């Protein structure tokens, strides 16, 4: 009985540790640079939402975002009041919920533009 219990305990311990190491941990290291205007109130609320999900942000205020949008090739019909850029260069335009940003960043996207 003791051998069976020890084996079962060991197997469960291995299982727990292996599943923890396989889980993505994007929040701990992910930084988004958020380009916005200094007067936009909804951007501040979105940044708070993002930070509450565990993502880190750095904010850069601009009087106009036209040049930023052009730099990242964001077409006029897709432009919003702020642009978030991950360290890997992924662009998040507008009020994207944090759950989708976390999900996207935890997956591989070899063909993303």
Question: Residue spans of the language-model regions?
Answer:
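Boundary at the C-terminal end of the N-terminal hydrophobic targeting segment
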Residues: 18-21, 28
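Solvent-exposed loop/turn segments at secondary-structure junctions
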Residues: 38-41, 65, 89-92
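Bacterial N-terminal signal peptides
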Residues: 4-15
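Thiol/selenol-based redox catalytic cores and closely related redox-interacting motifs
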Residues: 70-71, 77-113
